[in-house]
């Protein structure tokens, strides 16, 4: 009996022939609702996404240690607090096709539960915590923390002591803050100028622009509320412009993709005074594996695996210590990296479900790093020195910062936690996320 010899190339060719007639629908990151396209006059996707995120981090603090025998004094990071945050959000979304691979969408994040918890880290107690020590007896730094002194917003001193914090310093360091309410809606447009489904020699390229307007909703704290603790509202008073581009190209049962995006934020008039939100941008590299696809029933099962990284710029924003300290803090830049996997099942042409799990890590970064001030006065964004004196153009800049001069000092600088050697830092910061998503197509 003769045998037919096969080769790897023949197997690939056979597999290609097997899947050549399957619908080459774009990867999820590049799929856009369609309209006025042949026998498909109109598409609309109605989606519901439920997200749960757990964030755990260790809050450490710089602390000057006594010199060892024959050595010099040194600064180390001592353990202060364990930080945990549980966040649950519901995100309804509607995407409506306008023309060939052109759609508009609206999404509204609804925070169902947002709870933060602080407590002393393992090995830390009321007797050895540097934060508890400073709450009892705030240190004197450049005469800024003498009894009766305060710090705060330009024009009006904030009626809050330098160490007027929310920690239960004499017990276990516990503090809990819960937020609720609704967040700002997201309005955007998506367009695929090139589509792999229309031309299988080309990738699908999808461009997206969306805007998150900060209006109408109560924010975490209004400027007129100073002094006082940050509120329990979920909105933060920040407008956000978001830009993204994604690429995908189907090959047999594989659909690799790449997504890059950037968010440009700016504070609204209703934001907490001094808010300078962080910019962020990143990319995601992944692949969809399609082990099962039935064109007759219009069904598909997908395994989606991806890696991501994201950069966060410095800024005066809400941080892991803001609610506990009753203030926004200036944070250093950091990078977030992680991986996620998803199972996607398209049960029918009009219905699909997916479940995603992810784990992410933030690089260590300081979260209290305000500068003491600027010669000649400070300006935004951030705390930037001016070329000439802001309040007296005839005054020569002498290179010195007069901390007693309101024109030159940084009003957001808190010497107890912003002075090098006393700053707070976020270490061992991990995120774990689970997302359930359902979509109905009309």
Question: Can you name each region flagged by the protein language model?
Answer:
Residues 113-273, 393, 411-421:
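Outer-membrane pore/translocation modules
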Residues 84-90, 171, 179-185, 203, ...:
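Residues that define the transmembrane beta-barrel architecture of outer-membrane proteins
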């Amino acid at each position: 009996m003769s045998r037919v010899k096969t080769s790897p190339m023949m197997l690939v060719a056979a597999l290609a022939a097997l899947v050549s007639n399957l619908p080459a629908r774009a990867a999820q990151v590049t799929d856009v609702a369609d309209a006025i396209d042949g026998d498909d006059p109109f598409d609309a996707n109605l989606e519901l996404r439920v997200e749960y995120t757990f964030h755990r981090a260790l809050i450490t603090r710089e602390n000057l240690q006594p010199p060892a025998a024959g050595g010099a004094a040194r600064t180390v990071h001592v353990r202060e607090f364990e930080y945990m945050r549980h966040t649950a959000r519901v995100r309804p979304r509607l995407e409506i096709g306008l023309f060939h691979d052109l759609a508009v969408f609206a999404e509204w994040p609804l925070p169902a539960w947002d709870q933060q918890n602080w407590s002393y880290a393992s090995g830390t107690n009321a007797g050895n915590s540097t934060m508890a020590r400073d709450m009892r007896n705030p240190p004197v730094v450049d005469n800024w923390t003498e009894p009766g002194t305060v710090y705060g917003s330009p024009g009006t001193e904030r009626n809050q002591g330098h160490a007027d914090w929310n920690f239960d310093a004499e017990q276990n360091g516990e503090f809990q803050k819960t937020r609720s309410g609704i967040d700002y809606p997201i309005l955007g447009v998506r367009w695929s100028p090139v589509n792999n489904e229309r031309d299988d020699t080309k990738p699908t390229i999808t461009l997206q622009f969306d805007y998150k307007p900060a209006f109408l909703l109560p924010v975490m704290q209004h400027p007129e509320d100073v002094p006082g603790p940050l509120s329990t509202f979920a909105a933060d008073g920040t407008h956000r412009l978001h830009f993204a581009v994604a690429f995908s190209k189907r090959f047999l049962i594989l659909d690799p993709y790449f997504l890059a995006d950037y968010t440009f934020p700016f504070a609204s008039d209703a934001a907490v005074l001094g808010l300078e939100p962080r910019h962020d941008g990143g990319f995601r590299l992944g692949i969809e594996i399609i082990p099962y696809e039935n064109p007759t029933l219009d069904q598909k099962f997908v395994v989606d695996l991806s890696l991501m990284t994201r950069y966060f710029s410095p800024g005066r924003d809400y941080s892991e210590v803001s609610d506990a300290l009753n203030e926004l803090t200036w944070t250093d830049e950091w990078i977030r990296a992680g991986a996620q996997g998803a199972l996607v099942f398209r049960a029918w042409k009009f219905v699909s479900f997916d479940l995603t799990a992810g784990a992410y890590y933030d690089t260590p970064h300081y979260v209290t790093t305000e500068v003491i001030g600027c010669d000649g006065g400070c300006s935004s964004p951030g705390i930037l020195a001016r070329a000439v004196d802001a309040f007296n153009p005839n005054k020569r800049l002498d290179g010195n910062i007069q901390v007693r001069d309101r024109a030159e000092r940084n009003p957001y600088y808190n010497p107890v936690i912003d002075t090098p050697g006393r700053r707070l830092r976020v270490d061992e910061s991990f995120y774990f996320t689970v997302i359930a998503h359902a979509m109905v197509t009309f």
